[in-house]
Structures are given as structure tokens and as C-alpha cells.
């Protein structure tokens, strides 16, 4: 069998739909290098683990680029957080939250704003997810290391 489509409009409708659906559901490219986020180096393996979790649990509300524009966002009373701007109400004075504070917020969720708690997720997964979320904003790459209490 030979398919000869010149662009999407020249394809049979079912094939065009299949291409659109499959092509729009691609995860972000894999990380091959570590990144410094919040002043600490995060391995490529951890970032890839976080990316996989994000695309499994978060992308429907927060969107592929972390902009809060996922397909489910339209049905929510409050818009999901836009991770690109790195502003968190639970951080003091508009600063970036500590890594553990971000992990804790993911775990507990924000039920009153539509974000479910992820209490059943392993600590390692929560941490990797928090690290991946940081990749959306340059603020995390520019941040100094967290102060040790």
C-alpha cells in the first residue's frame, strides 16, 4: 500500500485526524545534560523522570509548556498556575520557593483551586516532578543556591 498525501489537507480524513492526534501528544525532548536549577545541579535522569511524570499527571491542566493552558484548563473555575513566570503564593515576598516547599505543595495540592493532592506519589517522584517544573522558567536557572537553615 502506498500513501501519497501532499500536506495534511490531501490525506483521507481518518488519516489526517490520526496524524493530528498523534502529533499533538508528543512529550518534550529528553534531557541529555544536567541543569542547574535553584542553585543545585539536577541530573538529566531526574529531569527525564520528572518530565515523564509531568506528561502523565500535569499536562492536561498546566499544558506542555507549563503555561497553564492544557485542554482541561478551560473547564476549571480558576486557571492553573503558569510555571513560566515562577510566581508562587506560598513563597515569601515573591521569592522562589524552597525545593521542599514546592514538593510539599505538589503533594498536598490546592483543592480549593482545583489542583488535586498527589499524596500517593513517592518522595523521589515528587522531587523529580518539582525539578522538571523548574525548567519552565529562567528564574530557576538564575537563582542562587537555597540557604541552609
Give the ranges of each region predicted by the language model.
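Bacterial N-terminal signal peptides that target proteins for export
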Residues: 2-14
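C-terminal motif of bacterial Sec signal peptides marking the signal peptidase cleavage site
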Residues: 20-23
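Electrostatic cytochrome c docking/interface patches
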Residues: 25-53, 143-149
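Periplasmic/extracellular electron-transfer cofactor-ligation site
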Residues: 27-30, 51-78, 108-114, 136-143
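Short, solvent-exposed loop/helix junctions and linker helices
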Residues: 44-48, 52-55, 92-97, 123
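Extracytoplasmic electron-transfer domains, predominantly the class I c-type cytochrome c fold
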Residues: 75-119, 126-133
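A charged, solvent-exposed segment within the mature domains of Sec-exported extracytoplasmic proteins
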Residues: 124-149
Amino acid at each position: 500500500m502506498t500513501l501519497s498525501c501532499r500536506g495534511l489537507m490531501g490525506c483521507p480524513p481518518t488519516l489526517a485526524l490520526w496524524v493530528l492526534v498523534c502529533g499533538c501528544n508528543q512529550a518534550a525532548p529528553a534531557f541529555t545534560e544536567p541543569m542547574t536549577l535553584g542553585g543545585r545541579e539536577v541530573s538529566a535522569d531526574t529531569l527525564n523522570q520528572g518530565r515523564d511524570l509531568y506528561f502523565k499527571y500535569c499536562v492536561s491542566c498546566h499544558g506542555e509548556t507549563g503555561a497553564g493552558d492544557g485542554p482541561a484548563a478551560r473547564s476549571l473555575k480558576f486557571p492553573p498556575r503558569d510555571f513560566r513566570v515562577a510566581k508562587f503564593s506560598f513563597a515569601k515576598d515573591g521569592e522562589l520557593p524552597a525545593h521542599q516547599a514546592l514538593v510539599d505543595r505538589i503533594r498536598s495540592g490546592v483543592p480549593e483551586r482545583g489542583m488535586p493532592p498527589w499524596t500517593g506519589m513517592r518522595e523521589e517522584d515528587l522531587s523529580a516532578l518539582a525539578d522538571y517544573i523548574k525548567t519552565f522558567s529562567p528564574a530557576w536557572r538564575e537563582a542562587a543556591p537555597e540557604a541552609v537553615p
